[in-house]
Amino acid sequence: MKQIRSGQSFLYRTNGYDSTVVEIRMRDKVTGSYLQVALTNAARRFPYLTQKLVEKGGAYYLHRDDNSIVAVKTDKFRTLGSMATGYHLLDVTYTGNCIRVAFHHGLCDGRGVMPFIEAILYDYCCQKYHKKFSSEGIRLPGEPIPEEETAEPFSREFYEVDEQAVQPVEHDGFALPESTSTPDACYHSEILLDEDTFVHAAKAAGATPTLLAAMLLSRCVLELNPQAEKPVVCNLAMDLRSAIGKELTHRNCVGTAYLPYTAEDMKTAPEELARLAQSRRPSWR
């Protein structure tokens, strides 16, 4: 068993923590039998993603789970780590032309689960379309698993931090009047953007696509809520693998950047806002 250090913050919560779901929309209807074979093969290559949680003395550990991982046809999200998922901390479901992979951040983060998803899609498409696609960049069953893939990014020792260099972070932001903690009252909308055009616009402003999206969304919130007296604080997820020298690990390496956006910022050119945001990086958590 391996004790969980990274990802601990997602385990000790009063009401648990919602899983994160990656939805893949295929062009054609999903064939369950092909998906199951692809999932079984991917589980052989990524055994560390099929583990279960074990609590011992108030600490949580990852332990081998011999239950088969099964792709289920349903549009419901099943509780991870429960009997319904064979106690696994990830779950693969499908309906229509959609494949959904749900995972718990105590096990891994988005970048950590992506090679697993890519392996499933590669295997599935080879079966579905009776074609051998290029496997470049795909981690296949039978390949050796580097130790770096399962490395724990956090040690028991604290990193040295120059407290004087750490800038204060704004947490107290404007909340939308319709915001609610009741899941049944939540909804989501989708916006389709031309990728090349958006990336070009971000580069022209000296920003990353994520940073530009955050600024645009924050601006929209303030334009629709001119009465807001507090800044809109956008939380941006950050991959800290490069910073800690653990590029290959699947474990949780997510940090958070807090980007405040005020009514005064609406008068500032995007290029200047991007420069200011980049300069605040040392204060990001």
What name fits each language-model region?
Residues 19-21, 96-98, 186:
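Short, solvent-exposed beta-strand edge segments and adjacent coil->beta transition regions
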Residues 2-3, 107-115, 119-200:
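Non-catalytic, low-complexity flexible loops and terminal extensions
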Residues 90-95, 166-168:
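A short acidic-Thr-Gly-centered motif at the start of a beta-strand
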Residues 96-108, 258-260:
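Short acidic, glycine/Ser/Thr-rich loop/turn "cap" segments at secondary-structure junctions
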Residues 59-60, 99:
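Hydrophobic residues embedded in beta-strands of well-ordered beta-sheets
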Residues 27-43, 102-118, 187-226:
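Acyl activation and transfer enzymes in specialized metabolism, enriched
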Residues 63-68, 103-107:
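Secondary-structure transition/turn motif
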Residues 1-57, 67-91, 222-285:
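Acyl-thioester-dependent acyl-group transfer interface
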